[in-house]
Design a protein with these regions (language model features):
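Catalytic domains of carbohydrate-active enzymes, especially glycoside hydrolases
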Residues: 42-58
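Hydrophobic beta-strand anchors of alpha/beta hydrolase catalytic cores
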Residues: 17-18, 55
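SAM-dependent methyltransferases
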Residues: 1-15, 280
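Active-site-adjacent loop and "lid" segments of alpha/beta metabolic enzymes
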Residues: 12, 29-43, 62-81, 87-91, ...
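Short acidic capping loops at alpha-helix termini that bridge into adjacent secondary structure
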Residues: 178-181
Length: 280
């Protein structure tokens, strides 16, 4: 199985690590923006050294209470980082739901659009469908980032999320997008209770029946804090544990902050697999 993207046909014959890059601008001044972009690009280089297979660059935080970032601010934060990252030799994903940002980063050579709204914003589907080859990750989110936890989902969570993702993929395919360009993300932490998030993990293998690769994003999520009592900056170990559990249950890609630790843990996991080679 391969994931077709703008510049790469990404083999999914082993678990891949997607490293998170924060490109939120510190200020609108040129100096502040340049300094932030330089730090983000240095972080990209470090993540690649640590073993990241894919970079995921985002200019807007989806956490509740995070300051709003408008279109101009997001473009100012993301574009300089994408411009530099596309020459680093690995696929570049951009975490955005704005069609204007999607179009701009694809014009710069970005490979993947990673959208928490699953292309539900007006014009977003058309941007992806009109591109000849970009990859896309469609995520499930209940409601929106500001209200998703005020009234979480109820009922059969696995069935609802599966149905949403399948319908989203089918809608995109109906616009001419080939299925091998699509990856699905159940959306851990986006409008679900702690119990529901872990239910998605426990039943994650059921999503594989729909025929699309899966991305799992457990890194530093509040559900990990709920079961460990650890603050967000102390959640590296549970994040790695969740990534391993997700891979064990069939996830093809794990989206993480702690790339080096996740890669090391996956090396141990891989060594224990049947017919594993112990030499990297």
């Amino acid at each position: 199985m391969n994931w077709q993207t703008s510049r790469f046909s990404i083999a999914l014959n082993r678990p891949l690590v997607m490293g998170i890059v924060n490109a939120t601008p510190d200020s609108f001044s040129d100096g502040g923006r340049y300094a932030q972009s330089a730090r983000a690009l240095q972080h990209c280089e470090q993540l690649i050294k640590d073993g990241a297979d894919i970079l995921d660059i985002g200019g807007v935080s989806s956490r509740r209470g995070s300051p709003a970032v408008g279109l101009v601010g997001e473009l100012g934060g993301v574009l300089p980082v994408v411009r530099g990252a596309v020459s680093m030799g690995v696929p570049v994903s951009v975490d955005t739901y704005k069609p204007e940002v999607m179009r701009a980063v694809l014009d710069l050579g970005a490979d993947i659009i990673n959208d928490i709204w699953a292309l539900r914003q007006p014009g977003a589907q058309a941007v992806v469908a009109s591109h000849p080859a970009c990859g896309v990750c469609l995520m499930h989110m209940h409601r929106d980032p500001q209200t998703m936890q005020a009234s979480p989902m109820d009922g059969d969570i696995v069935l609802q999320v599966r149905r949403f993702l399948q319908e989203s993929a089918e809608s995109l395919c109906a616009m001419g997008v080939q299925p091998d360009r699509i990856v699905l993300d159940p959306g851990v932490g986006f409008g679900k209770t702690v119990e529901q998030n872990f239910s998605l993990l426990a039943h994650q293998a059921e999503f594989l029946a729909d025929g699309y690769p899966l991305l799992a994003g457990w890194s530093r999520k509040s559900s990990l804090g709920a079961v460990t009592g650890l603050e967000v900056d102390q959640r590296m170990v549970p994040s790695v544990a969740a990534a391993l559990l997700a891979v064990e249950r069939g996830a093809h890609i794990v989206r993480v902050h702690d790339v080096r630790e996740t890669v090391a843990a996956l090396s141990v996991w891989s060594a224990a697999r049947p017919s594993a080679s112990l030499v990297r």
